[in-house]
């Protein structure tokens, strides 16, 4: 590494001397010498760029004080600038010198000077050889006109691209595909310059009629990286075009979201919601093609984690943000619901899509029964070889899992016989892989536990041990994992809603949380419950206070 640094310094001095000689005398011999050495000079520039991109602008100036002179001499040498490759690498190197947040007038002047050099290169790219003579004739100094020239040039190119997009098959008025491709390549190092935003947007939105993508992959990657790191801000229409035209960028955006969720605090849905909204993915997912890719990546995450509750909660929050974005979208641009969920019953999707807030609370029970009937029909009464299956129905259901979380509350708040439809809904939600016999067994176990809990709610005294004992009653066999999780959540709901449950809540949770995994599960349940109550406007000060106290105490222990 040290040897590479020494070699680069020696090469730097050699090429600085060469450029000075070429600059001082424009003779036939110097022109021939320039052409003879262009390929070697380009190789030096590539090495120079690899070194510069690892430094900040201040370090670059400290290490190479005359770097500006070297690049300027190269940029004003027509025999070097005549090569597209030279233009591209020179732009890359110049962008490494830009100070994103100038702290003094010197840094601001350097940025203005770089803008001027970039304008000169772009002028050469567009074959505007008369630009310099024209501005000199008007009496303007470079520092005055170059920033404005860059902005106007960008706006002109953006306008030309928009016209190109509108002209469609009118080949006489369309910009050549090679030129569009060249523009996208030149833009790569300029992506984070605010003045270039209109051109970036126009390139993304401009769709050619060519059978293959004409924009450079490096352009898509650079734009996507800048968006993810919040270095640029583009209209949603441009972001959607980016992710539609370049699938790897969409996949990287999803992976970037996953990384943020993994590195953040566990079981905090408010923070998850902020990350999801900040990603722009719910808004972009209003386009079915993007939604399907995003949903497929969620599906893979769910399968790889064996249905982890945290993944399910994240899918539910994403779906909630997506539905909100869908409601705000223009009605003229809306797609049929079937395009988002092609493997499930449209009538089931329509019912699940209803927001509980828009339904009177007195009708929640009836809606839950209707959801159960539709799901049961799709899962148990489907014809052989029909599209979808139990998993697809369950996968759709968990998108709108708020309905499932309401079932336990509805059962515990009613003194009537537990409706079979609601018992089936709970059994299916917690055990999607179960067959009919296993699901029926879970329903019997849950019904027995509910009976004991309702009886205990009328008792004058409750004990943590009694409640823990009840959790294992109603069956002569050991509870399977899905049933255990379901009954734990029933007990937690009972503690939050039953008048006597508040006094023994902590003791019961202490007995329940005998592993770190179950502790995290309880934390997730409490956080999700508070999040849902807040969203639905459910007011229960006593229950809410208890849930917050339990959540706070449990988080200190993990």
UniProtKB/Swiss-Prot annotation:
Impact noted for substituting residue 531 to A: No effect on protective function from mitomycin C-genotoxicity. No effect on IFNG-induced STAT1-binding
Annotated Gene Ontology cellular component terms: chromatin; cytoplasm; cytosol; Fanconi anaemia nuclear complex; nucleoplasm; nucleus
Tissues in which the protein is found: Ubiquitous.
Instruction: Provide the protein's localization.
Output: Nucleus; Cytoplasm
Instruction: Give UniProt keywords alphabetically.
Output: Cytoplasm, Disease variant, DNA damage, DNA repair, Fanconi anemia, Nucleus
Which is a GO BP term held by this UniProt record?
Answer: DNA repair
Q: What is the effect of changing residue 529 to A?
A: No effect on protective function from mitomycin C-genotoxicity
Query: Per its UniProt record, what InterPro entries does this chain match?
Result: FANCC
Primary location: nucleus
Work out whether the entry's keyword set contains DNA damage: yes
Q: Name the source's superkingdom.
A: Eukaryota
Assembly and interaction partners: Belongs to the multisubunit FA complex composed of FANCA, FANCB, FANCC, FANCE, FANCF, FANCG, FANCL/PHF9 and FANCM. This complex may also include HSP70. The complex is not found in FA patients. Interacts with ZBTB32. Upon IFNG induction, interacts with STAT1. Interacts with CDK1. Interacts with EIF2AK2; interaction between FA variants and EIF2AK2 may lead to augmented EIF2AK2 activation and cell death.
Disease in which the protein is involved:
Fanconi anemia complementation group C: A disorder affecting all bone marrow elements and resulting in anemia, leukopenia and thrombopenia. It is associated with cardiac, renal and limb malformations, dermal pigmentary changes, and a predisposition to the development of malignancies. At the cellular level it is associated with hypersensitivity to DNA-damaging agents, chromosomal instability (increased chromosome breakage) and defective DNA repair.
Protein task: DNA repair protein that may operate in a postreplication repair or a cell cycle checkpoint function. May be implicated in interstrand DNA cross-link repair and in the maintenance of normal chromosome stability. Upon IFNG induction, may facilitate STAT1 activation by recruiting STAT1 to IFNGR1.
Classification via PANTHER family: FANCONI ANEMIA GROUP C PROTEIN, FANCONI ANEMIA GROUP C PROTEIN FANCC
Q: This protein is called what?
A: Fanconi anemia group C protein
Q: Which organism is it from?
A: Homo sapiens
Q: What taxonomic lineage is listed for the species of origin?
A: Eukaryota, Metazoa, Chordata, Craniata, Vertebrata
């Amino acid at each position: 590494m040290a040897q590479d640094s020494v070699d680069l310094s020696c090469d730097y001095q050699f090429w600085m001397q060469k450029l000075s000689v070429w600059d001082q005398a424009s003779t036939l011999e110097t022109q021939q010498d320039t052409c003879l050495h262009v390929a070697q000079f380009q190789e030096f520039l590539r090495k120079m760029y690899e070194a510069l991109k690892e430094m900040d602008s201040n370090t670059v100036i400290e290490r190479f004080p005359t770097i500006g002179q070297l690049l300027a001499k190269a940029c004003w040498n027509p025999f070097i600038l005549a090569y597209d490759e030279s233009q591209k690498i020179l732009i890359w190197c110049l962008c490494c010198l830009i100070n994103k947040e100038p702290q003094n007038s010197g840094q601001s002047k350097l940025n203005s000077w770089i803008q001027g050099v970039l304008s000169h290169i772009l002028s050469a790219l567009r074959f505007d050889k008369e630009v310099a003579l024209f501005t000199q004739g008007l009496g303007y100094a470079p520092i005055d006109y170059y920033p404005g020239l860059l902005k106007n040039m960008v706006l002109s190119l953006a306008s030309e691209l928009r016209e190109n997009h509108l002209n469609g098959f009118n080949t006489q008025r369309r910009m050549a595909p090679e030129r569009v491709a060249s523009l996208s390549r030149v833009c790569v190092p300029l992506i984070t310059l605010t003045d270039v935003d209109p051109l970036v947007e126009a390139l993304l939105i401009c769709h050619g009629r060519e059978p293959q993508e004409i924009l450079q992959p490096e352009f898509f990657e650079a734009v996507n990286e800048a968006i993810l790191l919040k270095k640029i801000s583009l209209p949603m229409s441009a972001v959607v075009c980016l992710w539609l035209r370049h699938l790897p960028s969409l996949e990287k955006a999803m992976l970037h979201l996953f990384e943020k969720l993994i590195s953040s605090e566990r079981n905090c849905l408010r923070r998850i919601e902020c990350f999801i909204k900040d990603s722009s993915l719910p808004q972009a997912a209003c386009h079915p093609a993007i939604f399907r890719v995003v949903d497929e990546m969620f599906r893979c995450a769910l399968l790889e984690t064996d249905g982890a509750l945290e993944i399910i909660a994240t899918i539910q929050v994403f779906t909630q943000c997506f539905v909100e974005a869908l409601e705000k979208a223009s009605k003229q641009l809306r797609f049929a619901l079937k395009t988002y969920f092609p493997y499930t019953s449209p009538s089931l999707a329509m019912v699940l899509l209803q927001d509980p807030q828009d339904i009177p609370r007195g009708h929640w029970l009836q809606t839950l029964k209707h959801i159960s009937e539709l799901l049961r029909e799709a899962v148990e009464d489907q014809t052989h070889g029909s599209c979808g299956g139990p998993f697809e129905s369950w996968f759709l259901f968990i998108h709108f899992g708020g309905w499932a979380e309401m079932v336990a509350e509805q059962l515990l708040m009613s003194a009537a016989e537990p409706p079979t439809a609601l018992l089936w809904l709970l059994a299916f939600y917690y055990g999607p892989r179960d067959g009919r016999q296993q699901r029926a067994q879970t329903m019997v176990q849950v019904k027995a536990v509910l009976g004991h809990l309702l009886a205990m709610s009328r008792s004058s005294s409750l004990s943590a041990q009694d409640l823990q004992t009840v959790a294992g009653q109603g069956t002569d066999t050991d509870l399977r994992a899905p049933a255990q999780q379901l009954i734990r959540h029933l007990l937690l709901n009972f503690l939050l809603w039953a008048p006597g449950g508040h006094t023994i809540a902590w003791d019961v949770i202490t007995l329940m949380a005998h592993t770190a995994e179950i502790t995290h599960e309880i934390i997730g349940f409490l956080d999700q419950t508070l999040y849902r109550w807040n969203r639905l406007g459910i007011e229960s000060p006593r229950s809410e206070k208890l849930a917050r106290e339990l959540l706070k105490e449990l988080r200190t222990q993990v």
